[in-house]
Design a protein with these regions (language model features):
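Short "pre-J" leader segments immediately N-terminal to J/J-like domains in DnaJ-family
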Residues: 1-146
């Protein structure tokens, strides 16, 4: 069983911000991490940016959540998109959404490493608005010198 970060609210995603990536354009994730490893990284990154009241939205039906608010082990998402909303951080409110990869678990991983590459190591935070460019590609644009 995977340990979700303390204080993280996980809830069903009711509305995707923008257009979903077409299934034909989704790809296999270049990140080789288990959900447990990704959740540990998420916990570290949330602590590093002093995130309070983080919310993760996943396209899982409400009936597939356990009593404690976590998705059941065999919960199936209707699409792989994941939205992370961080209303209170040391760099201001942040919101990330991506559906580039085949599973929501794989889409969660880039957000964890993108925070380090963007806001934490470069001192630049992305705005709370969501764009169609995946978070790790947006961070590359922000963090690339000369841009």
């Amino acid at each position: 069983m995977s340990d979700y970060p303390d204080g993280l609210t996980v809830r069903p995603l009711t509305t995707w911000p923008g257009d979903l990536t077409s299934p034909a354009d989704r790809r296999v994730s270049p990140f080789a991490a288990t959900l447990g490893t990704t959740l540990s990284a998420l916990d570290r990154e949330l602590a590093a940016i002093q995130a309070r009241n983080p919310v993760m939205e996943v396209a899982i039906e409400p009936c597939q959540f356990r009593i404690d608010g976590r998705p059941r082990a065999r919960a199936a998402a209707t699409h792989p998109g994941v939205v992370l909303s961080l209303p209170m951080t040391s760099v201001g409110p942040l919101r990330y959404a991506t559906d580039r990869f085949l599973s929501w678990q794989d889409n969660l991983a880039p957000s964890c490493w993108a925070w380090r590459r963007c806001g934490r190591s470069r001192g630049t935070a992305l705005p709370a608005a969501v764009s169609s460019t995946p978070v790790f590609e947006r961070c590359h644009l922000v963090a690339t010198p000369g841009r």
